[in-house]
Amino acid sequence: RSANEREQLAQDWLALTVERDIHQFTKYKFDSDDALEILNAIAILENPNLANISKKVKVPARRVQSYLKILKMLFVIFEITPSKDSAGKSQFFLIDPILLGHFKASFEKKILTWIYLEMLCQLSYKAKKSNRISFYKTAKSSPVHLMYEADNHIVFAKVCFEQSFDSRDLLIFDSIKKKYKDKKLKLYLFYGGRERFNVDEIQILPWESIV
C-alpha cells in the first residue's frame, strides 16, 4: 500500500474507534477527543504507562484507566506488564503499526511494538500454555524489553535500537544470571546490525531474526 492509502486506513479506523466503537459502552460517557489523545500519547511516549499517559493528556488517571480497559477489549491496544520480580508499571502499545505512522511515533517505538507483536503472534500460533510476555527492569537499569517463561526455560530479550552496542547494554544480563541462577535461561540482544554471534551466553541477533 502507498503512504496515502496507509494514512487513509489509519484515519478510517481511528474514526470508527473513537467516534463509534467506544460509545457502545454507554455507562462510561467517553469523549472522542480524549480517546484520540490517549492513543496519540500511547504512540509517542517513551514510557507509556498509566501515569505518563494521564499526565500527557491531562485527564485523571482513573478516567484514563477506563479508556485503556475498553481500548484493550476492542483490540486497539495491548498491555505489557512488568514481571513479578521487576520494577516498573504496565505499558500500553498500539496493536496496528499503521497507527504508529499516523501518530508519527519514533523509530524506536515502531521497532519495539513490532517485536512485541511478532512474539505475541508466535506464541499464540505455537499454542503455548502461557503466551503472556512481560518486561524485566531493576531500579537502576535499562529494561530487558521481553521476558516469558517457556516449558523448561525463561527467555530474556533486550532490544538495542542502534546498529551497534557496547558492554553497558549487556550489564543487565549479569544481574539476571545471578538472580535466576537456578533456572535455565535463554538470553538475547536484538540490534540493528547484520552479524549473529554470542557474548557470555547471550545470543546477539539482528532485529529481523525474531520473525
Locate each region found by the language model.
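Active-site-adjacent loop/helix micro-motif of nuclease/hydrolase catalytic cores
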Residues: 163-173
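Domain-level recognition of nuclease-like catalytic cores that cleave nucleotide substrates
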Residues: 192-211
